[in-house]
Amino acid sequence: WTAARFTLMNLEIEENKLPAKDKLQLEDKWILSKYNSLVAEVTNNLDKFELGIAVSKLYDFLWSNFCDWYIELVKPRLFDKENPTRETAEYVLCYVLSGTMQLLHPFMPFITEEIWQHLPHEGESIMISRFPVYDKALDFAEDEKTMEAVMKAVSGIRNRRAEMNVPPSKKSKVIVVTKDTKTYNNSKQFFEKLASANEVEVLPDKEGIDSKAVNIVVDGAEIFLPLEELVDKDKELERLNKEKKQLEGEIKRVEGKLNNKGFVSKAPQKLIEEEKAKGIKYREMLEKVLESINDMENL
């Protein structure tokens, strides 16, 4: 409902249609390709009466692809009345949301009808509208792969900044080292909007990059973040060492239990397995904390 409300608030178009292919931006092709795959998968699930799987795929698409990514990616275009690609974003938003409501209608008839009625449409009811079908013309496999590489880079930056307690309000330079310079030069706006970048530099090699810059490796690229000026090094090291001490204490406690013959012989197997799982989790957490300490000390 929130996604529908956002879409409706930003629509000025009066019909539901797809724009010409040459007007589609990378993020448009990505969401259309993901939606097209969803149509094929859900149709196949319905044919096999795999209703639970169909609903799960619809849920994942709406939240993970449409809401979490596409809407965020196109906000700059929608909010800029002078942007020549604004109308294209509107058409794609409407097309994908309308089609997803049709796919979801068998499971949620009332709310999907209500949303569909507020979108540009043909016909009296979603119930008698043409059910979406797979369209080979919307198979943008290469563009989908390219967009997802950029998304992984954005996610990697956000995760690393979060690990180092750098708030989104503190902007930093982002340096991308990649052979695919064209893709990343054309994607700078995504890093500025979604990864708190105030400058994006795309380079073919690492020459001249500060050795203290934090690096993130993703498929096809290596990202460098010069975060030294944005982090209170002493305060962050104090926090990380405190967390390290707590985790080491938890690991010692778990190991003590599991090495206690009395506990192992008397405790239910389920409880023993739970303690083993805790030990694995704490060791993984400790490994990440140690990596963060190492990164911080090298700043």
PLM feature segments, named:
Residues 1-299:
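Feature 926 captures the class I aminoacyl-tRNA synthetase adenylation module centered on the KMSKS loop
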